[in-house]
């Protein structure tokens, strides 16, 4: 395939066009008065969303050069979403602003490598300042505030997430499901989560979110390593006859056994997903027994005389729902094993009383928490399928933001933190050389962009709002919902520090890479041929 090569200004301009197209589509969603974006779907109804990363993932441009720029921007949103779970639109706006400002300076003769160093040093300084400004999350009120803002100013969602955290604790498991009714409800059920994800990405059922989700599934729980196909076939046949999905939890699944599960899943013969067993050594066996008791199954192990080929359906666990991501597995049960779970918890508590080891004590407490803590399930309801999808995305964002807030604290929201921190950059840049100072100025101007866009989406002149907020001190900012200037903490307009930090770091990283790009190599588009004619002049058949 022939390649197209562009250099210097021409290369950067082509990339910038792609960056701007993606960023312009994403940034209309920021703030309480942000708009929605409609995404066409090849199958089914179009999707109307307000979520930056979902929009970014959908954008594929026809021009390969512009598409490369759009992919760079998509990386900003995806990485921020992976780390913090929210703040993707802010990250996109910051990156676009840094790219535009940087390009102006490079065109005027600035050194790209010095700009990059200036951007990186200023970002490192700002990350320290964000941590210094963060306040720890205190009580239910703060949790509800963070969730409300992240869900697009929906106090009902904020209150529900606060209740869910009350029910299962701050480190507890909270999952989001689609409800059959119009109302959004919260219920606490028996369940467990452990830190192991799918062995192969071919097991995923939702390629957008990269998760495998099944309802009413069987669980094969074994301490053996599965590699031989012959051992597994009888079990797979029994489950396939029932027409229900299967979750395999084993020491490892490899070779023929893994290939068979993947092929059956892809062909639609048997919906299956395989994960490695949690923990190590004796603790692994104990955890597997915990999962077996929770799901009403048995641990299949040759140590206790049960061979894989002899496994019947009543030896297998049953889950109401399973959700497997690349690094976590969540099992939700119907609560029918409650008595057995309580008995198991009492047994672990006895072990806890007799142990002297601090490490063992910690691990036993962890097992009790996993077994007894349960799972809070937020069942999302809406009038239409389109509204349901959008609402579910908003609630997932709010949940991620709340967890991030518990982790690193909260800062004033609505773009106020970044704007106020820009005041410290003139003093900081005295430590940089003249060329690096230009990089610091690029970051300083970019910090105004999120608030500017929030005001713009609310139908106001962004630069006027930015000036008014700059006249005041932290934590003052602009409440776009009411159009007033307020104390952001007092008003409950807060962002998780982790979200603000991740957005800034990822935006700076991509902008710095872009500004030091001197050449692009992309595939040359094939010349269009006339319909029906082959490239060899129509002499294709003899």
Swiss-Prot record:
Reaction equation(s) it catalyzes: ATP + H2O + a folded polypeptide = ADP + phosphate + an unfolded polypeptide
Gene3D superfamilies according to UniProt: GroEL (3.50.7.10), GroEL-like equatorial domain (1.10.560.10), TCP-1-like chaperonin intermediate domain (3.30.260.10)
Record's keyword terms, sorted: ATP-binding, Chaperone, Cytoplasm, Isomerase, Nucleotide-binding
Amino acids binding ATP: 29-32, 86-90, 414, 479-481, 495
GO CC list: cytoplasm
Subcellular location: Cytoplasm
Highest taxon listed in the record's lineage: Bacteria
CDD domains: GroEL
Single GO term (MF): isomerase activity
Any Pfam family: Cpn60_TCP1
GO biological process: protein refolding
EC number: 5.6.1.7
Task of the protein: Together with its co-chaperonin GroES, plays an essential role in assisting protein folding. The GroEL-GroES system forms a nano-cage that allows encapsulation of the non-native substrate proteins and provides a physical environment optimized to promote and accelerate protein folding.
Subunit details: Forms a cylinder of 14 subunits composed of two heptameric rings stacked back-to-back. Interacts with the co-chaperonin GroES.
Membership in a protein family: Belongs to the chaperonin (HSP60) family.
Official protein name in the record: Chaperonin GroEL 1
Species annotation: Synechococcus sp. (strain JA-3-3Ab)
């Amino acid at each position: 395939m022939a390649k197209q090569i562009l250099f210097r200004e021409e290369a950067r301009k082509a990339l910038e066009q792609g960056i701007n197209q993606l960023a312009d589509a994403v940034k209309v969603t920021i703030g309480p008065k942000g708009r929605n974006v409609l995404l066409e779907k090849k199958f089914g109804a179009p999707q109307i969303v307000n979520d930056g990363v979902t929009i970014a993932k959908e954008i594929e441009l026809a021009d390969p050069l512009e598409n490369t720029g759009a992919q760079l921007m998509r990386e900003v949103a995806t990485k921020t979403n992976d780390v913090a779970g929210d703040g993707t639109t802010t990250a996109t706006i910051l990156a676009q602003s840094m790219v535009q400002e940087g390009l102006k300076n490079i065109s005027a003769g600035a050194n790209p490598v010095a700009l990059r160093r200036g951007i990186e040093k200023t970002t490192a300084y700002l990350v320290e300042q964000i941590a210094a400004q963060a306040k720890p999350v205190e009580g239910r009120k703060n949790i509800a505030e963070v969730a409300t803002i992240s869900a697009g100013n929906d106090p009902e969602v904020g209150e529900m997430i606060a209740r869910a955290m009350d029910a299962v604790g701050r480190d507890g498991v909270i999952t989001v499901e689609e409800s059959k009714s119009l109302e959004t409800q919260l219920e606490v059920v028996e369940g467990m989560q452990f830190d192991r994800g799918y062995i192969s990405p071919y097991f995923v059922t939702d390629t957008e979110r990269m998760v495998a989700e099944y309802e009413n599934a069987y669980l094969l729980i074994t301490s053996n390593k599965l590699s031989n196909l012959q051992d597994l076939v009888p079990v797979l046949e029994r489950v396939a006859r029932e027409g229900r999905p299967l979750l395999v939890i084993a020491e490892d699944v490899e070779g023929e056994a893994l290939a068979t599960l993947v092929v059956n899943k892809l062909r639609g013969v048997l919906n299956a997903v395989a994960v490695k067993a949690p923990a190590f050594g004796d603790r692994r066996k104990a955890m597997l027994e915990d999962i077996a008791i929770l799901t009403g199954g048995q641990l299949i192990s040759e140590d206790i005389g049960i061979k894989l080929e002899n496994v019947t359906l009543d030896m297998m666990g049953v889950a109401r729902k399973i959700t497997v991501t690349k690094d976590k597995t969540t099992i939700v049960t119907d609560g029918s094993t409650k008595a057995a779970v309580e008995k198991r918890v009492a047994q672990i508590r006895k072990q806890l009383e007799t142990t002297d080891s601090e490490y063992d004590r910690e691990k036993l407490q962890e097992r009790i928490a996993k077994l007894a803590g349960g799972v809070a399930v937020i069942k999302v309801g809406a009038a239409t399928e389109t509204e349901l999808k959008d609402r579910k995305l908003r609630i997932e964002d709010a949940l991620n933001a709340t967890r991030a807030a518990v982790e690193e604290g909260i800062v004033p929201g609505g773009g106020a933190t970044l704007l106020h921190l820009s005041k410290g950059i003139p003093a900081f840049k005295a430590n940089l050389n003249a060329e690096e100072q230009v990089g610091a100025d690029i970051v300083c101007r970019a910090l105004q962009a999120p608030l500017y866009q929030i005001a713009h989406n609310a139908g106001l002149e962004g630069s006027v709002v930015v000036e008014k907020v700059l006249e005041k001190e932290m934590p003052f900012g602009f409440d776009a919902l009411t159009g007033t200037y307020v104390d952001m903490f007092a008003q409950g307009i807060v962002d998780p520090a982790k979200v603000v930090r991740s957005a800034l770091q990822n935006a700076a990283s991509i902008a710095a890479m872009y500004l030091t790009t001197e050449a692009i190599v992309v595939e040359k588009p094939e010349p269009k041929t006339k319909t029906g004619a082959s490239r060899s002049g129509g002499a294709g058949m003899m």
